[in-house]
A protein has these predicted regions:
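Catalytic-core regions built around general acid/base machinery
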Residues: 17-30
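Conserved phosphate-coupling serine/threonine residues in phosphotransfer and NTP-handling enzymes
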Residues: 37-39
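A structural signal for isolated positions on well-ordered beta-strands in alpha/beta enzyme cores
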Residues: 32-34, 102
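Metal-dependent catalytic neighborhoods of phosphoester/phosphodiester hydrolases
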Residues: 41-52
């Protein structure tokens, strides 16, 4: 079973106890659990300590695969170019989240981000 975190498992940033219980039952039945999220792994670990319920975590919009049992992290894309991130910051793009493989912000900055990409 693959499931999203925000708005699916977690509502208003909280995973309900009954949801955790259902996930535990599912896992004990021998089935596999995969958590899929756009969040960066350190952020996810900070808000959801129950990651060990999952066999795999697909984070950073698919750019990182994490195995909780072994704590193995596999990045499937190169890190963001520091010059690119610096240009976005100089252009005043906020919020700006820089992960191991992704750079994320909100839609109002779309034109600025596209301009920086073109350069």
């Amino acid at each position: 079973l693959a499931t999203d975190y925000d708005g699916t498992l977690a509502h208003d940033g909280v995973v309900a106890k009954k949801t955790l219980t259902a996930l535990e039952r599912f896992k004990k039945s021998g089935r596999k659990l995969v958590l899929v999220t756009g969040r960066e792994l350190p952020d996810l670990k900070g808000v959801f300590p129950e990651l060990s319920l999952f066999d795999k975590v697909v984070a950073e919009n698919g750019a990182m695969i994490y195995t909780p049992a072994s704590e193995e992290e596999r990045v499937i894309a190169p890190p963001p170019e520091p010059k690119f991130v610096a240009r976005l910051k100089r252009q005043g793009v906020k919020p700006l989240s820089v992960g191991r493989s992704i750079v994320a912000t909100w839609e109002p900055h779309q034109a600025t981000v596209l301009e920086v990409i073109k350069k």
